[in-house]
């Protein structure tokens, strides 16, 4: 499938160049999830079964006017795509908080202290050293980034911050 995706992407780029639109186009290629192959020996395969890095880290390629080659090392979210596009593709200059929850992916040093990720029924608050997983009934577990339970762990301040952040959607 990667070969086929590459072929299709090549066609899109060739078409944009043929129409003279390539130099004015911001192209973003990414995925909605990663894939587990029993990476941590905990029998997780596929996707949508946990919030560890093999399932939530996705590749992203961004090309366009003013986009410098580089790699983002900090913790980011797909919520950061819209602010990037609004600022760099559409030229919006007002504060990002006027229209988005995320940050500009092209801003130097972008690195969230936590990000939220969801599956069909669960969500996770992902921090550099832990993941707090909350299921559809409100039951929770705290695991390390390799999915090993952290015994007697308490909620970090990030979980409370995330709950406040979520409230704006559930009033």
Q: What name fits each language-model region?
A:
Residues 17, 21-67:
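Histidine-centered active-site microenvironments of extracellular/periplasmic hydrolases
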Residues 14-23, 64-171:
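Membrane-interface soluble catalytic domains
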Residues 2-5, 9-12, 26-34, 60-62, ...:
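Beta-strand elements within well-structured catalytic alpha/beta cores of enzymes
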Residues 4-6, 39, 103, 107-108:
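Generic structural "secondary-structure junction" signal
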Residues 1-4, 53, 70-77:
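Extracytoplasmic/periplasmic, Sec-exported soluble proteins
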């Amino acid at each position: 499938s990667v070969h086929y995706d590459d072929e299709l992407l090549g066609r899109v780029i060739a078409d944009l160049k043929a129409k003279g639109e390539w130099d004015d186009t911001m192209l973003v290629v990414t995925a909605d999830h990663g894939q587990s192959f029993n990476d941590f020996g905990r029998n997780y395969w596929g996707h949508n079964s946990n919030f560890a890095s093999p399932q939530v880290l996705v590749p992203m390629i961004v090309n366009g006017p003013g986009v410098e080659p580089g790699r983002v090392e900090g913790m980011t979210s797909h919520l950061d795509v819209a602010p990037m596009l609004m600022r760099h593709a559409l030229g919006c200059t007002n504060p990002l908080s006027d229209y988005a929850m995320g940050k500009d992916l092209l801003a130097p040093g972008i690195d969230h202290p936590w990000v939220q990720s969801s599956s069909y029924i669960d969500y996770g608050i992902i921090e550099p050293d832990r993941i707090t997983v909350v299921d559809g009934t409100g039951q929770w577990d705290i695991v390390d980034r390799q999915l090993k339970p952290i015994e007697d762990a308490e909620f970090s301040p990030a979980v409370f911050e995330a709950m406040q952040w979520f409230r704006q959607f559930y009033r």
